[in-house]
């Protein structure tokens, strides 16, 4: 699985068979706002979603920028996987109840 950061469309993409999994984002200063998660029905299982989120969050961590998860599924994933908590900007923890 090859993760693509499509900067023109401001989204992460992952090709799955004939479908595309997408996380839309907005980049502001040194923060990336993850605004929408789209998982194709053909692979809509929790394992795939988690793998996709891990790929995206690892890419963001490598770029050393903060992440603001505005999409509920992504915020829930970060709540559940505390190793990504360090990527959140100061002050955001209480907003997403982490």
Regions found by a protein language model. Give the residues of each.
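Active-site rim helix/loop that mediates acceptor-substrate recognition in acyltransferases
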Residues: 1-11
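C-terminal structural segments of small proteins and small subunits
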Residues: 66-90
């Amino acid at each position: 699985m090859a993760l693509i950061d499509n900067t023109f469309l401001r989204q992460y993409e992952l090709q799955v068979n004939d479908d595309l999994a997408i996380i839309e984002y907005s980049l502001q200063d040194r923060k990336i706002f993850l605004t929408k998660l789209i998982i194709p029905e053909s692979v809509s299982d929790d394992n795939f979603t988690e793998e996709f989120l891990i790929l995206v969050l690892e890419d963001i961590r490598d770029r050393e920028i903060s992440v603001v998860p505005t999409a509920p599924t992504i915020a829930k994933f970060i709540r559940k996987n505390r190793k990504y908590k360090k990527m959140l900007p100061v002050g955001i923890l209480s907003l997403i109840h982490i």
